[in-house]
């Protein structure tokens, strides 16, 4: 009798845990779809407490952190997702974008930290391209990261300035932008960014 009672009690605990996890996940999903990313974070964090390996909840949590502009936590969430599912292409993409935002918009960020973030973003976009070479937004975002890195390394600041690396990054940026523009000739925004990259490369080559 005691064994039956214990089994029933444990079963009820498992069912309650699964129900709580599903409820929080569904509430988080609804908030996400409604564009209320901060509320989505609250619910999805609870879902992760119930099951820290829930890939769907983890993806939505990283996505919600990103759109709530909590880029550091977004990077951490997508990093965990990648450790559980290395083939999740979108996780690399959003982690790369989060790192790019951190590099460019973190107040008083050190140049050394900005450099690390941009290089990490480039690696993330490159990995996304390895997994799905047909999605042009990966090339576009890698081009932007290459551009930002090239401009950073072109600054004549001790222990930062590196003309060869700056030129290499800007050339890579141009190649990626050209690929996007060839597939979408009407993209004036890409054409403008491409010309800016060419101009920066020309200026750096004269330094």
Q: Which stretches of residues belong to each language-model region?
A:
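Helix-start (N-cap) detector for alpha-helical repeat units in TPR-like alpha-solenoids
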Residues: 21-24, 55-56, 89-90, 136-137, ...
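Terminal, low-structured helical/coil segments at or just beyond the last alpha-helical repeat
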Residues: 22-23, 27, 155-207
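Register position in tetratricopeptide repeats
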Residues: 33-34, 67-68, 101-108, 148-151, ...
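Canonical positions in the second alpha-helix
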Residues: 46-47, 80-81, 127-128, 180
